């Protein structure tokens, strides 16, 4: 990415991986702030409102639909669904040098270089990444204390969607 490419606030129903190659990136996810430095990574859960600002930063991102990696009726699909249907959110910040960050780095490298069989390597690294997240319990499950934040996120999504749909129109506060 260009060193000054700002990431406007948005959301999507896919996961997103981000790896900072140089500089710093100030990332906001569902109202929580993270400052990423060279080598740090972020895992952005499906449906999370996120955006950020680079500071002399070059970073890579990939968006993916986890359901495409899950085989219908597989043991992994059952474990994944049991966790994420309860509203689990993965811990976004992955520090440089951590096992999860190393897996993300290898994932981007495989996609960039595309060696023979890279498709298998990429999918294998995705499975390892999610296995590591489960192993380390690097996630939280929504509780009643998080409901206020969930409402705030839903309101932000509604506002962003209205802006997106009516971008070319004049919008007033009365609207």
Predicted regions: what is each one?
Residues 19, 27, 42, 62-64:
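Preference for bulky hydrophobic residues occupying beta-strand positions
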Residues 88-96, 111-122, 130-175:
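Short, Lys/Arg-enriched, Trp-marked, Pro/Gly-tolerant hinge/linker segments that flank
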Residues 36-49:
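Conserved metal-binding segment of the jelly-roll/cupin
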Residues 1, 49-112, 131-141:
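A hydrophobic/aromatic-rich effector-binding and dimerization subdomain
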Residues 1-37, 54-56, 74-79, 88-91:
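Generic protein-terminus/edge-of-domain signal
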Residues 34, 51, 60, 117-121, ...:
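Short, surface-exposed helix-loop/turn micro-motifs enriched in polar/charged residues
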Residues 13, 46-48, 173:
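Short beta-strand or tight-loop elements
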């Amino acid at each position: 990415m260009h060193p000054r490419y700002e990431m406007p606030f948005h959301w999507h129903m896919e996961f997103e991986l981000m790896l900072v190659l140089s500089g710093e990136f100030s990332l906001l996810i569902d109202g929580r702030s993270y400052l990423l430095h060279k080598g740090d990574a972020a895992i952005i859960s499906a449906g999370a409102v996120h955006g950020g600002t680079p500071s002399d930063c070059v970073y890579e991102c990939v968006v993916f639909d986890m359901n495409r990696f899950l085989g219908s009726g597989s043991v992994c699909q059952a474990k994944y669904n049991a966790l994420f249907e309860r509203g689990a959110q993965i811990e976004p910040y992955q520090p440089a040098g951590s096992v999860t960050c190393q897996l993300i780095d290898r994932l981007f490298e495989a996609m960039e270089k595309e060696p023979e069989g890279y498709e298998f390597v990429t999918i294998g690294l995705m499975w390892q990444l999610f296995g590591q997240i489960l192993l380390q319990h690097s996630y939280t499950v929504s509780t009643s204390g998080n409901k206020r934040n969930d409402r705030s996120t839903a309101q932000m999504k509604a506002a962003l969607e209205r802006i997106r749909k009516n971008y070319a129109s004049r919008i007033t506060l009365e609207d």
